[in-house]
Curated annotation (Swiss-Prot):
SUPFAM superfamilies: HupF/HypC-like. It comes from Bradyrhizobium diazoefficiens (strain JCM 10833 / BCRC 13528 / IAM 13628 / NBRC 14792 / USDA 110). It comes from the Bacteria. The gene is hupF. One of its GO terms (molecular function) is iron ion binding. Pfam families: HupF_HypC. This is Hydrogenase expression/formation protein HupF. GO terms for biological process: protein maturation.
Length: 98
């Protein structure tokens, strides 16, 4: 399984950026984004920033990663997915029939 990580830009030169997530830093390509500033949250997949995230999205993705770890350890993981409990799943707009 491949996961995108919600990382925060620490420094950037426009082409690449040093990004951080939970104490880990890595240099990632910024070629798919239009030069976001330091402090911006980005979704990083295979050392490439693929889209901008707002703070809430970054928090939710981080919680989901924690939930996956808890599930793999055999622990209860509901608290990590509080935004999904007690609601029906929803298809993205582009998959809904009109």
């Amino acid at each position: 399984m491949c996961l995108g990580l919600p990382m925060t830009i620490v420094e950037t030169d426009g082409v690449s950026a040093l990004c951080a997530f939970r104490g880990e830093q890595r240099r990632v390509s910024m070629l798919l984004l239009s030069n976001p500033p330091v402090g911006t949250h980005v979704l990083v997949y295979i050392d490439t920033a693929i889209r901008l995230l707002d703070e809430e999205e970054a928090r939710l993705i981080g919680a989901a990663i924690d939930g996956l770890g808890a599930a793999l350890d055999g622990e209860d993981c509901d608290r990590f997915f509080a935004d999904l409990i007690d609601r029906e799943p929803q298809l993205p707009a582009h998959l809904r029939s009109e």
